[in-house]
Amino acid sequence: MNIKKSLVIAFSAYGCFLFGQEKTIDTVYIFDSQMSRVKRFHRVNAISTEDIRKNSSSLSELLRFQSPVYIKENGRGAVSSPSFRGTSAGHTAVVWNGININSNFLGQADLNNIPLFGYDRLEVKSGGGSVQYGSSAIGGSIHLNDQLEFGKGFQGSLYSEAASFGTYINFAKAGFSNDRFSFKASANYSISQNDYEVKEKEYINRNGRYYNTTFNLGTSYKLSSHHIISWQSQMFDASQRYPIFVENGNKTKYNAQTLRSLVAWDFRQSSFTNSLKAAYTEDNFQYFGDIDQPKTSGADGKNYIIKNDLNYFITPKINVNAIGEFQVNTAEGYQSGLGSIRRNMGSVAGLLRYFPTEDLRFEAGVKKDFVEDITSPVLFSFSGKWNAVKWYSTGMNVSRNFRIPSFNDLYWKQGGNTNLVPETSLNVDMDHEFRFGSLKLTLSPYFMHIKNYISWLPTPYGYWAVFNTYRVDSYGLESQVTYEKQFGKHGLKLNGGYTYARSINKQTDKQMVYVPIHKAVANIDYRYDFLRVYVQGLFNGLTYTTTDEKKADALDPYFVLNAGVSGTLNKKYTLGLKVNNITDTVYETVSYYPMPKRNYSIYATINF
């Protein structure tokens, strides 16, 4: 792992005082203070630690079965791209503790090069969010958040899993805290030979091996009743081999290393909070055209970030929030089409929130980004939420969002284009939430208009080049139903969702590629005393893979069913069994790369 040791000194403050609804820093410290405010106006779905264990092989698998996100994966464990609401991976922001971590090289994230274990909160937000979270937050955002608790003493846990295809997952976490000091560390190691076979397709996932290692460290200290300093770091090292279609094919691989470090200094009073953060992130990769030879190409990227978030209640009903950020981005390519790059960028955002009653609230925001050599648009957002009656609430969100061109888009030789302008989108969506006892139903229609779409196209000169091209209209419906009930020792929990997505290229009036029109997920949990059983289903509709909507080349609809059972003794020891793809379905999320058929895993957890 060729990451240089880096020291980051920063200052930060978490503080949010929205009607006294949030936990104070006396109990828990959350690095992404903005998220608690976002939840006042937007629907955010949280995935619990227990739910993560249902789909523990990767972040890709978890989001595929437990969110509205469509995951395009070049076979299990290979390159994986997330997309919301008929958009693309470039319109999806991945946010680590409030910091946007999309690759500067690609402008998007490979979910299989992001660790799954180690976070305290994993949350999914659909819809625009560039005012709060920056570039690419057009279709939605995925939030990976850490928190540090106080007054808990010593806590720890061990998790180990063995699964089909030579897959092993191990995760350990330990922490200690008293009233003023909190410390937490965790480590994860996952490896898989990943050599599954799909006989119906005459396919063997040759050269599919992968592994990854993650270390997380976090600490926080209360200087006084109003000041707290905190630090969180993550180190990740991974290797993916890319599948080949013939026995004697050329074997390739991709190695990646990331380092993320964030230091924070928080100041908090009853009506005023300030959060000053400094972060350093590093993303390195090496591509091997032959796994037995030295690297063929690669690149190193470094980001230096300082961010301040000030939140002030002028009156109990009026709240102002100012956010400033400055970054220095550097990159160095190695035989990859990129040379040496340095870019400065910053932003200033302001939000005004008004709470006329406990059941009615409004928020308006404006933001201006300053990106070196790129003209960025003024962004805005407006949100309102009304709890009309006990059983019904509604909300509306209107926003302008953007995506800046990536380093590859701008500087790749040949084909990069320094004259590109950012993509911009106008987003409109509504939330209608109905509650009937323990049952909750949410309907969220949406519309997006994206212009200056950045696309790579073939040229007469024998290479591909990038241009601002067509416009795209995306519209549809996201829905979610939840139900939870306890009957003595019996417990039942249901979480399901359906997404209808139309994403139309206005130049051709055809559906965008790799955008399923229909997707549905369902998770049912049953508990009795120490026993837990779950069933999990995924339906994915017809998915076009060509721009002319050619059905012969489209991915067929599919349904996949998973299930698992576990038992817990003394609230400390858990043993479980999972069966994935019980239906033995043959399916693909990317053409020519089938996913695994029926497979199994067993796992054990110890809490202490």
Where are these regions (language model features)?
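Outer-membrane beta-barrel signature, preferentially recognizing the C-terminal barrel domain
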Residues: 247-268, 374, 387, 393, ...
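Gram-negative outer-membrane beta-barrel transporters
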Residues: 357, 447-449, 468-545, 571-572, ...
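Short strand-turn segments of transmembrane beta-barrel domains in outer membranes
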Residues: 129-131, 141, 146-176, 187, ...
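N-terminal periplasmic "start-of-domain" segments of outer-membrane beta-barrel proteins
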Residues: 25-53, 81
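Short acidic/polar hinge/loop motifs at secondary-structure boundaries
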Residues: 71, 99-127
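Extracytoplasmic beta-strand/coil segments of soluble accessory domains associated
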Residues: 60-99
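C-terminal beta-signal and adjacent terminal beta-strands/loops
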Residues: 450-451, 539-546, 565-608
